[in-house]
Amino acid sequence: MNRTERFRRVALLMASFLRNLAYLRAFKDVHARIPMDWTRDFWITQGGNCTDIAVLEWCKLFADRADKHHWSRIVADLDAFKPSLLARLGMEEAAYSDYVTSVRRYRDKFVAHLDSDNVMDIPMLDIAERAVFFYHQHLTTQEVSDPLQVFRPLPSSSAELTLYFEHHCRAAAHTYNEVLPPLRTI
């Protein structure tokens, strides 16, 4: 696989992460409206699947240094990338490392395997989201000479990535609002 193909695959993982995160956020907004009937399992499973796929995709990009899509195997200037990422996230190295460990732990203990842990600690994905936006911006401004050519039809700029995410948030919210009954008040 050549470098251009790797960039494209990284962009596909980013898009998948953001789509699933968008669907998850829209799901959380309507969670209280999920009916207590035979469809409930469907809705709960759908929300859980979006969480799990987002976590899996993010781990490929940020948590598994051995993965061929991990940022450390993609970016040219390794010494500059991580400090810039931490600065963008507003995190110290130790806090970021703890966050990566928590996301990886959820993936390993509950998504990839069902280990013996009794408590599922689902990670918040706000930091993961900001990391993906940073990584994408880095690729499109510093690594890829022609982002439009490499990423087409995926977002090839930060502005396009934001629109992509917002579009999927709106699409999911629209779908949920069309299908789920309104919240009943007493």
Identify the meaning behind each predicted range.
Residues 1-99, 122-186:
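Amphipathic alpha-helical interface segments
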Residues 93-120:
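Histidine-centered, metal-coordinating catalytic motifs and their short helical/loop contexts
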